[in-house]
Amino acid sequence: MMLLDLEEKTRVLVEDIVERSAIGSGSIFVLGLSSSEVVGGIIGKASSREIGQRIVKTILEVLEPKGIYLAVQGCEHLNRALVVERELALAKDLEIVNVLPTLHAGGSGQLAAFDYMEDPVEVEEILAQAGIDIGDTSIGMHVKRVQVPLRPIISELGGAHVTALASRPKLIGGARAEYLADPIRKN
């Protein structure tokens, strides 16, 4: 896959998910990324720092002007900890953990987050309002309930399968209750 094509498809994917998930300024968007899968390999076996940099930089270019925070999930070797801006970690009172990601412990996306974020830190867990999973890395543990699957307009990025999640408030009250319009499903 050509790198410019990778950047353009990443931009289209993220813009679509942000729009359909109805998130805005102050929201958190989680990224799960297997650069190994993007290049056609097996998750964790062919990590590419350059692929991680291209994808994370592109996502930040989409999210930052909207005031949306990016959280980059690491692999299971780091217990799926996430890289976020220190400002977010402090504002949300998130548990900061002491680890520096490597290509094979944390992954290319986390390394790129350390390259491109202003003051990156690792946090143990987070509850994001939406996110994208590039390469079947399983982001669900970091997306707030109630999770709503979104079918991305592009289903593969290179060799990686792409899925996405948004979240909505729980519906409570039963048959007599009335609800606000659902901005995700538009019904």
UniProtKB/Swiss-Prot annotation:
It comes from the Bacteria. SUPFAM superfamilies: TTHA0583/YokD-like (SSF110710). Belongs to the UPF0340 family. HAMAP family: UPF0340. NCBIfam families: TIGR01440 family protein (TIGR01440). This is UPF0340 protein stu1894. The lineage of its organism: Bacteria, Bacillati, Bacillota, Bacilli, Lactobacillales.
